[in-house]
Every structure is written in C-alpha cells, then in structure tokens.
C-alpha cells in the first residue's frame, strides 16, 4: 500500500496566488514558480539554489512564491524553521530569513533560530511570540493544505 496514493477521481488544484498572503517576489509580468518547501529538506535546498540561479539568469522576468511544506515526520526542525520564517515575515524580513535558513540548513535548533532573528535585527521577543502564535500556525497549515490539494 502506498501512503501517498490518491484516488484517480480526485481533482487536483493549485491554490491561486494571493498577494496578501503568499510570499512573492519578482515581476508581475515574469514567469511564475511556486515552490512548496521544507527548510530542513536537502531537495528543497537544491531547489532554492536552482531558483537563485534562474532568478539571476532571468532578472526581472521571474516571479517566485514560496509556500511551506514541512515534512515533520523526517525533518524534526522543519516546522520550527517555517514558524521562524513566518515570524520574520511579521516584521517584514521573510525573504532575508528564508535565505538564511537554507544557507544554514544544518543549524535549525531553537537557539539558532533566535540567533538568526537577532542577526537580522528583529525584535526577538516579538519574534518568539509570533512564531508560537496561532496566526503563524494557521499560515503554515494553509500552505500545507494547499500543497496536499495540489498533489
């Protein structure tokens, strides 16, 4: 039995981009890449590097969105890292922490995450509050649900 098998009649749909909710960068006129990623996953890190390369090559012709998909069964720090990225987003620094998390993928302990927040000049007390809060958990759940619905 395959755990991830889906019935043949299940309709798959990618949730449309929501500029008010999704983390999006790049030109509105550019090609769109939506990544569902996990900060602790080596394959997500490979995708991160590939997207960096494509962004450099296409310049203003790429639009990129990142959605969380922490694989908590195999990556014990993935959910905490996603929550940290969302807490950084509250302070307007999502993309900065996003990049830092992938560059330092082997260092995702709580003390590391707090250190990254301080390094970026975030209000660490607010960062801690936000990453433990309901809205951050709901945001991550929304992304995971969207990823599951997308197949």
Where are these regions (language model features)?
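Metal-dependent phosphoesterase signature
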Residues: 125-137
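Structural alpha/beta surface segment adjacent to cysteine/selenocysteine redox centers
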Residues: 32-119, 123, 128
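Extracytoplasmic thiol/disulfide redox context detector
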Residues: 1-73, 136-151
């Amino acid at each position: 039995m395959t755990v991830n098998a889906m019935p043949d009649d299940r309709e798959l749909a990618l949730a449309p981009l929501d500029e008010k909710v999704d983390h999006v960068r790049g030109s509105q006129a550019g090609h769109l890449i939506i990544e569902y990623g996990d900060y602790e996953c080596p394959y997500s890190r490979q995708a991160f590097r590939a997207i960096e390369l494509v962004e450099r090559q296409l310049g203003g012709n790429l639009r990129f969105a990142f959605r969380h998909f922490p694989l908590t069964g195999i990556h014990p720090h993935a959910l905490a890292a996603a929550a940290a990225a969302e807490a950084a987003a509250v302070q307007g620094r999502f993309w900065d922490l996003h990049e830092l998390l992938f560059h330092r993928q082997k260092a995702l302990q709580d003390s590391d995450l707090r250190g990254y927040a301080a390094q970026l000049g975030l209000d660490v007390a607010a960062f801690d509050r936000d990453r433990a809060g309901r809205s951050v958990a709901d945001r991550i759940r929304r992304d995971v649900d969207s990823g599951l619905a997308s197949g």
